[in-house]
Amino acid sequence: MCPMTRCSVALLTSLMFFAGVAPADSAVPAAPPVERCASAPEVGFAQALVCYHDAIEQQPLIYTRVGTSNVTGVERRDYLLTSQDWSPEGLVTPARWQHDVAIYVPKEALPTRAVLISTNGTRHPLDGSTAQPSSELPPEALAALAQRTRTVVIALSDIPNQALNYQGDANPRREDDSVAYTWSLFLKAPQQRMTMPLHVPMAAAIARTMSLAERELAPLRIHRFVLAGASKRGWASWHATIADQRVEAVVPFVIDILNMPAVLEHMSRTYGGNWPIAFDAYAKQGITSQLQTPAFAQLVQLQDPLRYLDTPYRKRLAVPKYIVNASGDDFFLPDNTQFFYNALPGIKALRVLPNSAHNIRASIVDTLAPFITRLQQQRPLPQVSDTLHPGKAPQIRFRSSEPPTQLQLWSATNPQARDFRYACGIRYSSTPIAHANGGTVSVPVQVPDDGWSAYFVEATYADGFVSTSQTYVLGKQRYPTQAPPTDHAACSTLLGATSGAAVR
């Protein structure tokens, strides 16, 4: 069924101001500071994200309440939010970004804190099709999360707005096609297009939603937010965390790309100079062939959360964070965390979801619930540390400050390639680990005779919270010398600059 916020736009546009709230399609006044953020010499690449956020937050807050309903005993309040007009140099249409916002308020909701989950959706459908609401989390799942945690849950859709049309481009673009295209536009003129990468307006829309929630949830004094999102929406959640001090914790799902230069080099070498087929949009826009250029280094300054460690925004990366990755991600390698996890300051936990591809939506609620409950109860996360001790008898040493109720080792082997994608038929199996009285265990692992093996330790705690070690990949060689074999499209790779093959 089409949600009320999508079916009632014509009616809503005729509404007048009420309770200090503007109709959803009221004109957004021109804001010169927004243009300044795109190209002013005094705004550097590491400041553009925050500059744009601050400029948008200075604009009037434009939204309309469109209805109230009940979902399995939880009150749901629906809004239509206009977050911004975004069209650097007039290159993008439609410029106006609108979003369905659903706020789930459980009975006896705890005050001050809310969870904000960014989701997808198609607000501007292609010719001949209809607008589509978010497909990531059903209302029942969001209501269940609110009930289980006694926490207000906010679902923000249309991150990013899509499909978008770009000047001179005949193809309306969505998801990674849209992200990659904005990157290609940025790379052509970085100094003039610092607000061009699509994550910039995505992060600003998250901030606008926090402002809406503060106003509408004033009786609960909501002013602190836990951000969550998957893939590019998880990336935007990192960016919103950097830009907005109202964010007190972040849970990014399947966006295992901090320290972009090191991670991308590792990925290219792992695939024998090729790229996973999931990178198709970025390869088509020439992104993967520009990784060594000065322009890409400037993109990294803006895009890469880890680069903000060297800026005044370093403290924003110290908020509690629960990084959730997939063991068989279509985009990212299971051991990418080696390039960034230990460098992240502050309270943190890692979870690797075994036998999962990039689409991990079924695990989001069960992963979030114990994390949020611990925040609400002011209970610390378990402090976990792990190291690989190599040698003739390699071991993973795993230590937890809190005793788990279950401890197991997950492992998978690919005898042909350093490739652990779920789409390639790789499956992990688990082995129980005896608990150690002292909190530290040494877990034997093996270097396979052929190919590579991946290992991680998983700890489950009494409240259902799950924390894992980083994933360690062992083989007689660190990297292969050729691209992995494939027998179907989802498991293929794309030609890279250093590869001798086309599509394998």
Write out the residue ranges for each language-model feature:
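Catalytic-loop region of hydrolases
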Residues: 28-111
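Glycine-rich nucleophile elbow surrounding the catalytic serine of serine-hydrolase chemistry
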Residues: 229-239
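Surface beta-strand/loop "capping" patches
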Residues: 370-411, 430-439, 444-446
